[in-house]
Every structure is written in C-alpha cells, then in structure tokens.
Amino acid sequence: MIVLKWLFLTISPCDAAEPWQLGSQDAATPIMQGIIDLHHDIFFFLILILVFVLWILVRALWHFHYKKNAIPQRIVHGTTIEILRTIFPSIISMFIAIPSFALLYSMDEVVVDPAITIKAIGHQWYRTYEYSDYNSSDEQSLTFDSYMIPEEDLELGQSRLLEVDNRVVVPAKTHLRIIVTSADVPHSWAVPSSGVKCDAVPGRLNQISILVQREGVYYGQCSEICGTNHAFTPIVVEAVPRKDYGSRVSNQLIPQTGEA
Amino acid sequence: MEDEIELKTAPADFRFPTTNQTRHCFTRYIEFHRCTTAKGEESNDCERFAKYYRALCPGEWVDKWNEQRESGTFPGPL
C-alpha cells in the first residue's frame, strides 16, 4: 500500500507549462483553486447551452430541409417562447455571476496582515527582487537580480526559457505581499500556478497578496511586451518550508553583501 | 541569523485598500520624516515608520527621494 502511495502520489504537480497542455496548471494558492473551481462551474453551463443549441440547430436543419418541407412557415411572434428565452438565459447568467463575483471580491480581500513583503521590479530584460523587511538602514536590503539561464547553459531536466539563476524564495503557508513595479517599461509578473498576473508599471506599485499552500517550484513568464527579450524574462518562485526560509534567505544574503 | 527570522512587515493599511500602493509607500516615507522632525533624529518611535517604508518602497525610489530631500527639491509635505 505504502509502495503504491510512493509510486503514484509522488508524481510532481504541474507547476510549469507542459507541451500540448490543455488545462490549467495545478493550483498552489487559494486564488488559483478558486479560479479553477469557477472554470468548472462555468464549463458546466457552457456544455448545457452548447448541447441545447446544437440540438435545436441540428433538429431544425433535419426537419426543415427544403426537400422534405418545401413550404416555409412565416412565424414572426411567439409570446411564450420569447418570455422563456429571456428568462432562462438570465437565470443561467445569474448562476454564473454568483460564483464569479464571489471569487472576484474575495481575491481583493486582505483579511490577514502579510508576513513578508517582496518587491518584484521588472527591467529590460531581467527581474530584481528586494526583500527589505530586515534592514536597519536605507541600504542593505537583500536585493538580487534574476536572469534567465540561456539555452546553452541548461542542465539535463531543466526547462528551456523558464529557468533562472536566482529564484524568488518564499516561505510556504505564509501570507505574502508582492509589490510589483518596473524600472523602465511596462512588464507583467505572472505565475499561473499561483493564479497571479500583475502588471509592472513604472512609477506605480501594484500589490498582490498570495498564500502559497504547498512547497514547490513555480514557473511563469513576463506577460507584457517589453522589448526584444520579452520572451526571455521568466519568473521562478520557490516555496520552501517556513523553518528553512530563514537560512535560505541568509544564504542568499551572504554572497550578496560580498558584492554590495 | 540561525534562529527563526521574525516574519513581520508593513501591515495592510485601511487608508490604501486597493491594488495601487504607490501612495502608501509615499505616505509612510513622509510619516517617517515628519516623525523625525517632530521627535528628533534618534527617536525610536520613528523606527516603525522607517521599517514600513523600507518594506514597501523600492530602493531606487528611496535613494532618489533622499537626494531630493538633501537638495531641497522633495515634492512632498515633509
């Protein structure tokens, strides 16, 4: 039993784009789980409507074929059907709108104060991340650049156009505030498995609150055209257990203060 | 930093409930400097505001504002 569990439950979740992928990446945050659930809700009504419309269409084409039914009827009114075809779509719209608005407003609710603030600053064509919660003066914040690893330098098993040299290390199961901005042109910070896409606008600080629920490595790409290397500025978020976060951050701090 | 780093940052401010936190960062910076003007440079009460603006504002913005303050061209109600 345990062997079976080991074999099947350690399949890695989809946290990066897969070739020929049809569905969403696996959710790592409550927001993404909400988005996926909303998608399933809407898809149900979508199939209902699709089957209904196709049925009516095929039925009309079959029964009113000019060879079988040469004389067209001239019907211009039908009060009952008009009332029904107005009421039913509005009821269906309501069923779609309720979970949609619930998700939309809950995404903006900041109920718990975040524990960490990370600044993601977009440049042409790399990212800078600042972790400044621990400074005692205006200098010294943990800052590092994150460049894509070029194809020639990739190791076996790494993803093309998705890997970076320095990942954003975050603690899992912790409320984070990510402040997204840009130093030159608009970029966008997107991580699909976390349900995040936030534009990085120069001169503006956009805040997103996320809670990464499981450890793992999550990949994303720049989502706003920003010049020639727009396709070559990925984002990699690594969620580590909360107790390891301190040592990971200080390990990154040591080489950084050597240069800074 | 072997023991647990205390995870604390600028709290959510009800004055700035929306996504755009530019004004939040700017306000915290101004609050810190007004606090030091009122209470003196060495006061510890103002350190709270300092932590907040450092958490929220990009380092480049802080450097630029510090230079502007020094040259007297800072565009804010200090």
UniProtKB/Swiss-Prot annotation, chain B:
It is found in: Mitochondrion. Pfam families: COX6B (PF02297). A motif (Cx9C motif) lies at residues 25-35. Specifically expressed in roots. Disulfide bonds join 25-57, 35-46. Keywords: Disulfide bond, Mitochondrion. Belongs to the cytochrome c oxidase subunit 6B (TC 3.D.4.8) family. This is Cytochrome c oxidase subunit 6b-2. The lineage of its organism: Eukaryota, Viridiplantae, Streptophyta, Embryophyta, Tracheophyta. The gene is COX6B-2.
